[in-house]
Regions:
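Short alpha-helical hairpin
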Residues: 1-19
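Short amphipathic alpha-helical interaction patches enriched in hydrophobic/aromatic residues
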Residues: 17, 21, 44, 62-67, ...
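Divalent metal-dependent phosphate-bond-processing catalytic cores, especially two-metal-ion Mg2+/Mn2+ enzymes
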Residues: 22-49, 60, 110-209
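Short, well-structured alpha-helical segments
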Residues: 30, 34-37, 55, 92-103
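An active-site-proximal "capping" alpha-helix that borders the catalytic cofactor pocket
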Residues: 36, 71-86
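His-Asp-centered metal-binding catalytic motifs of divalent-metal-dependent phosphohydrolases/nucleases
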Residues: 51-68, 72-76, 97-106
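Hydrophobic, well-structured mid-protein blocks that either form specific transmembrane helices
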Residues: 79-114
Length: 209
């Protein structure tokens, strides 16, 4: 089993694909996609999935943020499918699987991803690291609501945490015993305690002013 990404594919992605993420703001920018790539490669080694396919899926997964966020996963899949350069390394069947994986990555989708590649990128995109989740949520709220003050951002942040990550939230994990399981429990403990959640919010909010 190949454990390392092809250098040729990596060079293509790093020069032609990843720079596009500089257009998307910090919450969905280069830092985020690089974390998703890192998480995906770790899961590829655990699951035995094709590491080159996993890498490409992770690299393309948010390219659709160039359009409406609500359909960005669909747009990202179309971008991948239409990129003829990928035919140098992948068959048409592999490209179709990668397109579907990109489409299936969105956290609010209740449908199980159609392949292991969709499960990997969905799991990697969850990226359940408490500080990282809080930071990205605050950055996203500020980027998309430039006129709102700190208290209004807090309300948006707290609502998002409850809606997505709480015990009744919509987030789903698809790979059993992944690192995300333990992290999600710790995150939920913080969300349950609004005073602790507010402390974390204040600390991060002040650090990014």
């Amino acid at each position: 089993m190949i454990q390392q990404v092809s250098m040729e594919i990596m060079e293509f992605v790093e020069t032609q694909i990843l720079p596009k993420y500089t257009e998307f703001g910090e919450s969905h920018g280069l830092r985020h996609v690089n974390r998703v790539i890192k998480n995906s490669l770790e899961l590829a080694r655990i699951t035995g999935a094709d590491i080159n396919m996993v890498y490409v899926v992770a690299a393309y997964h948010d390219l659709g943020m160039s359009g409406p966020r609500a359909i960005h996963h669909i747009t990202s899949g179309k971008i991948l499918m239409a990129d003829a350069r990928l035919k140098r390394w992948f068959s048409q069947d592999q490209i179709k699987i990668m397109k579907e994986a990109v489409e299936d990555h969105r956290a609010s989708s209740s449908r199980q991803p159609r392949s292991i590649y969709g499960k990997i990128v969905a799991e990697a995109d969850r990226d359940i690291d408490t500080h990282e989740i809080f930071l990205r949520a605050i950055l996203y709220a500020k980027e998309n609501n430039p006129g709102k003050n700190k208290e209004q951002i807090w309300e948006l942040f707290a609502h998002h945490m409850d809606e997505k990550y709480s015990v009744h939230g919509y987030i789903k994990l698809w790979i059993p015993n992944s690192p995300n399981e333990k992290e999600l429990k710790m995150l939920r403990d913080i969300i349950e305690d609004k005073a602790v959640l507010r402390q974390e919010f204040d600390k991060i909010y002040e650090s990014i002013l």
